[in-house]
Amino acid sequence: MKNNKDMSKIQDMTFIRSLIIYGSQYGTTKRYAEELSRRTNIQVTTFKDVQEINNYDEIIYLGGLYAGGVLGMAKTLKKLNNISKKRIIIITVGLSDPTDETNINNIRNNIKKQLKKDIFERAKIFHLRGGIDYSKLNFAHKTMMKLLYNAVKNLPEEKKTAEDKAMIDTYNQKVDFLDFSSLDNIIDEIF
């Protein structure tokens, strides 16, 4: 009986039009999006190129975390109509530990500020760890990171967040925490 139920779920899925959209400044989020597309056989596009977003039943949005925001997410998801009939999955990609509860709460609160209430309440949210290569940052991002680093490096240890610690540990380095196996839970959610 379980096999029939599983098959029924798969048959139901064939009528769902899904789209993976990503916002990536330096490439880590793009790598996750393309791998997710490869594994799920779902079309992928950048938020800058997305068209006809309302033709899809399921939107899977991956966005890099920059200065508390998810790159391109608010601009893209505000175009959605008929929210009650959409399935929305949001995946953030950042430097800090995606299993740290304080970090997760901070990210969720920032997402909540960026989205309309109905979109936020419908969204399933996941967090992935990305990477950074300071040598590839543009001038504005290098300056911002230096200012942030200087602001948090001398904080008492108990006042530093997981995000602060990750920035201090990786400052001025090239690090890559990309882990494609972390997509497995997201794929389970999609199917």
Language model features by range: what are they?
Residues I10, E58, G68-F191:
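FMN-binding flavodoxin-like domain, especially the glycine-rich phosphate-binding loop
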Residues M1-K85, D188-E189:
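N-terminal beta1-alpha1-beta2 submodule of the flavodoxin-like/Rossmannoid cofactor-binding fold
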